Amino acid sequence: MTILSAITSISRPNKISKSVISSNGGSSLSMGSNSVSCYNACGGGSSYSYSSSYSGSGLDYSYKANYSSSTGYNSSVVIASSTCHCS
């Protein structure tokens, strides 16, 4: 992916408006213009850590959400760009 196409894709994150991951109290990832916001990510006393990675083309991105807790969790959802850390 070229820098130009990456900028174009990130600046137009209108394909997906919201994505939600729920576990141990739940975490909600809501997408703004170019941002991802975390809400209630530390419910149940768990420690959450989110990191983003991009794949595909156009407005398709792979957002990988990982958090460490007593049970452990690893998932990925399609969403626009950004990174969120909650503890």
From Swiss-Prot:
The gene is hssl54. One of its GO terms (biological process) is sorocarp development. This is HssA/B-like protein 54. Belongs to the hssA/B family. It holds the Pfam family Coiled. Disulfide bonds: none annotated.
